[in-house]
Every structure is written in structure tokens, then in C-alpha cells.
């Protein structure tokens, strides 16, 4: 038999317009100088049977969005397709042999259902996640300082007003003591402290001046002016 010479391999490439498909395959001619007919023309039948076509090598396809109503909030659905997040590709089936069963420690039912739900559920909308993470409005309780420690000098003011009311200083001290009580009821700690200091000052002044007058009176009574 005469063996024919094998010519150079012919490369047939095409570019599809649907879904931006780009593919290229190689076909080897059966006889010398023969190439397969272009796409759409009938192939030559005089050269014998041709080899089977090699499947597309290097072709890639853009997955179409799944049919059905889109899931998510209105803000996510209303976005144009270009701005929406691409769907995660489905995992390819692996041809590896089945693995031996592995034993794991027992888990609670709630944690198991949560892990299965997190692994199999599609990614939730970020707007829904933000709504779920929003906390309820908290009630603010104002804690006022303890005003019972503020001394109003009320008894001291009454004593000075009744017995040692020198130049009405005891009356003024009593008025400030009453103001301290009112501000303690209103939870005004700063005002109560200031009025308490003022009442104390007037009580000290009234007591000192009244005591000085009493001492002078006793001195003049013990040593009258006629002795000098």
C-alpha cells in the first residue's frame, strides 16, 4: 500500500456572537493538502470518513441568571444587572473516589441546624442583615446623686434665729437652710451645696457675734464702769 503524506494541520477558528463565546479547535486532514470545509458548507465525501471532531477546548460560557423572581429587598432588586453582585458558581462535581466515613463528636441540635442552614442557604441581602442587627431603643434612666449627705444646718439656723439672732443673721441663715432643703428635693446637688455653705457661714458669724456680745455683757456686769 502506498502511504500518503500528511500535510500541515489546518486550524479552524470561529467567533460566536451569542453569549460572547470564543472557541478554537484543531482538525487534522485525512489526505495531503486537504482541510475541512468551512462551517455551513457540505463536507467532501470522496476523501473517506473524517475523524470525529474534537470537543471545544478553552471555551467558556457566562452562566445565565436563574429563572424565577429575584430574592432580596427592593434596594437590591431595583439595581441594574451590572451593579448586582454576581451569583456564586455552582461547585463542579469531583471525580475523586468516595472517602471513608469520618467520625465527629456529637453536636447539639440547634448548632447542627444552624451550620446546615449557613452552609446551604444562599447569601442573604445585606440590607436585611442590617435591619436584623439594629438594636431596640434603650430606656435611659437618669441616676441622680445622693443628696442626703448635704447638711442643711436647719437646727443650727433655728437656734440662731431664736436665741442668737444678731443683726438678723440667724434669720438669713434659716432662709438659706430652707433653700437647701428645696434644692435637695429638686435633686440640684450643686445649688444645695452652695446654699449649705452660705447658711453655715451665716450661722458661724451669727453665733460668734452673739457669743461675743454675751461675754461683753457678763464682763460689764462683773466689772461695772463705776469702778474705773
From Swiss-Prot:
Lipoprotein recorded as keyword: yes
Cytoplasmic side: 176-200
Keyword Zinc carried by entry: no
Record-annotated membrane-spanning stretches: 155-175, 201-221
InterPro entries: CD225/Dispanin_fam, IFITM_antiviral_protein
Membrane topology value: Multi-pass membrane protein
Spans annotated as Disordered: 29-49
Localization of this protein: Cell membrane
Residues lipid-modified (S-palmitoyl cysteine): 167-168
Similarity comment: family membership: Belongs to the CD225/Dispanin family.
Protein name: Interferon-induced transmembrane protein 10
Amino acid at each position: 500500500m502506498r502511504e500518503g503524506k500528511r500535510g500541515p494541520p489546518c486550524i479552524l477558528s470561529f467567533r460566536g456572537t451569542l453569549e460572547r463565546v470564543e472557541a478554537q479547535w484543531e482538525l487534522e486532514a485525512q489526505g495531503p493538502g486537504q482541510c475541512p470545509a468551512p462551517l455551513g458548507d457540505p463536507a467532501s465525501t470522496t476523501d473517506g470518513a473524517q475523524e470525529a471532531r474534537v470537543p471545544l477546548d478553552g471555551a467558556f460560557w457566562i452562566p445565565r441568571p436563574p429563572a424565577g423572581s429575584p430574592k432580596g429587598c427592593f434596594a437590591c432588586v431595583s439595581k441594574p444587572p451590572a451593579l448586582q453582585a454576581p451569583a456564586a458558581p455552582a461547585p463542579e462535581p469531583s471525580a475523586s473516589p468516595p472517602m471513608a466515613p469520618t467520625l465527629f463528636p456529637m453536636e447539639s441540635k440547634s448548632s447542627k441546624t444552624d451550620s446546615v442552614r449557613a452552609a446551604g442557604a444562599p447569601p442573604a441581602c445585606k440590607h436585611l442583615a442590617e435591619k436584623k442587627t439594629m438594636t431596640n431603643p434603650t430606656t435611659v434612666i437618669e441616676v441622680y446623686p445622693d443628696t442626703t449627705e448635704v447638711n442643711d444646718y436647719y437646727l443650727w439656723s433655728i437656734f440662731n434665729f431664736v436665741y442668737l439672732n444678731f443683726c438678723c443673721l440667724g434669720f438669713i441663715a434659716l432662709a438659706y437652710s430652707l433653700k437647701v432643703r428645696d434644692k435637695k428635693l429638686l435633686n440640684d446637688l450643686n445649688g444645695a451645696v452652695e446654699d449649705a455653705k452660705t447658711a453655715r457661714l451665716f450661722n458661724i458669724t451669727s453665733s460668734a457675734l452673739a457669743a461675743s456680745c454675751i461675754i461683753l455683757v457678763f464682763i460689764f456686769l462683773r466689772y461695772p464702769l463705776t469702778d474705773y
